[in-house]
Design a protein with these regions (language model features):
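Acidic, metal-coordinating catalytic cores used for nucleic-acid/nucleotide bond scission
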Residues: 68-79
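Long, charge-rich intrinsically disordered scaffolds of nucleic-acid metabolism proteins
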Residues: 85, 93-210, 214
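Phosphate-backbone recognition surface of nucleic-acid-processing proteins
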Residues: 219, 225-298, 302, 338-341
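Gly/Thr-rich phosphate-binding beta-strand-loop-beta motif of the actin/hexokinase/Hsp70
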Residues: 2-28, 121, 153, 224
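Low-complexity, acidic/Ser/Thr- and charged residue-rich accessory regions of DNA metabolism proteins
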Residues: 255, 292-311, 316-341
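Short, basic/hydrophobic alpha-helical segments
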Residues: 46-66
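Short glycine-rich, Thr/Ser-proximal phosphate-binding strand/loop in the N-terminal lobe
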Residues: 15-47
Length: 341
């Protein structure tokens, strides 16, 4: 029988310029004290990644290395790219910052430093054994960055437009108009880049095309959904409900049973998109209309019903993409078993 390799967990505390790395493993004598774990700082660049692996080689030897870090937006994503490029065989887990912070709080550490955080994150990996993170494709990451920049520019333009009627100075009014015009040009340029990215990728193009056949889901909504969570094909129905933050969270303690609420453990942008799509789409989709009326008849609150429809709508999109078929308002009536809702 093949002997199972010992896994060494590397905990990364990632910053803008540097990252702190610590190594941990379970030995025959048990777990070492957290503050005694080896730790070192490296530059957050390709050279720093190379130096990390050179340093870690002295501890890893024949053992398997698994890296875990908390999500820090572009910093953790860029560092993961360098890690994969340097050592593609090494597994990397990017964990929800809330989970890691809760774990660190439970350790009751005396101080808060980058070194201690890296050591605690390494212990998090040893104890929790997180699964490797599914890395989005380069195209999805590019679309995500472009779509978020587009949203930021639109928000800035709306603020300027709302202020336009209150401006009394002719000079300021002229600057306001010029800035709005510049933002409009930049927004159109970003939209053109997004379309080019989608057209170049046949798989993403096909998925967007199928999603836009559902009432309420526009081209912008479709690519924003993909930008936030990637292809819908990669998730089960339960995983998709959880990653969207729309799964209900139950609160019960002893004889006290509190009302459930939305978990919200994911992208707020995704829920915003689904909310707007459901407002436009539910009245045009008989299945969701019936579902909405049944919940309202049971006395459910309107916002709770809206969230349930958002979740149902997302799962319908997933089923359409998996089965590669356009929206059909009657498809649930003759294909109940094919769609995992």
């Amino acid at each position: 029988m093949e002997e199972k390799k010992t896994i060494i967990w590397a905990g990364f505390d990632v910053g803008k310029e540097t990252f702190s790395a610590s190594l941990d493993k379970i030995t025959e004598s048990g777990k070492a004290k957290i503050t005694s774990l080896p730790c070192r700082d490296f530059k957050r660049n390709p050279e720093g990644v190379t130096k990390f692996f050179q340093w870690a080689d002295g501890f890893v030897s024949e053992k398997e290395l698994h890296i875990v870090m908390e999500t820090t937006g572009c910093y953790s994503q860029q560092l993961t790219d360098w890690l994969n490029l340097s050592h593609p065989e090494v597994k990397v887990s990017i964990e929800n910052a809330r989970n890691i912070h809760a774990f660190i709080d439970s350790l009751n550490l005396p101080h808060k430093t980058d070194k201690l955080d890296a050591q605690a994150i390494a212990r998090f990996g040893t104890e929790r054994q997180p699964h490797p993170t599914k890395r989005p494709s380069k195209t999805i990451l590019t679309i995500r960055e472009l779509s978020r920049e587009r949203t930021a520019l639109i928000k800035a333009r709306v603020e300027l437009q709302n202020r336009r009627d209150t401006i009394t100075s002719s000079v300021v009014r002229k600057i306001n108009a010029q800035t709005i015009a510049t933002l409009t040009i930049q927004i159109k340029k970003i939209e053109k880049e997004i379309k080019a990215c989608i057209v170049e990728n046949e798989e993403i193009l096909a998925e967007v095309h199928i999603m836009t056949t559902m009432p309420g889901v526009s081209f912008v909504s479709a690519y924003n959904i993909l930008a936030e969570i990637g292809s819908l094909k990669q998730y089960s129905a339960k995983e998709l409900s959880a990653i969207s933050g729309l799964a209900p969270r139950i609160r019960q303690s002893g004889s006290s049973v509190h009302s459930s609420f939305m978990s919200r453990r994911s992208s707020g942008r995704l829920r915003q998109i689904l909310y707007l799509d459901s407002v436009a789409g539910v009245p045009k989709i008989p299945v969701l209309q019936d579902f909405q009326q049944r919940l309202l008849a049971k006395g459910k609150k309107k916002m709770m019903v809206r969230c349930a429809c958002m979740r149902k709508m997302l799962l319908m999109l997933r089923s359409m993409v998996i089965h590669n078929r356009a929206f059909d308002e009657n498809f649930l009536k003759f294909s109940q078993t094919s769609f995992d809702l």
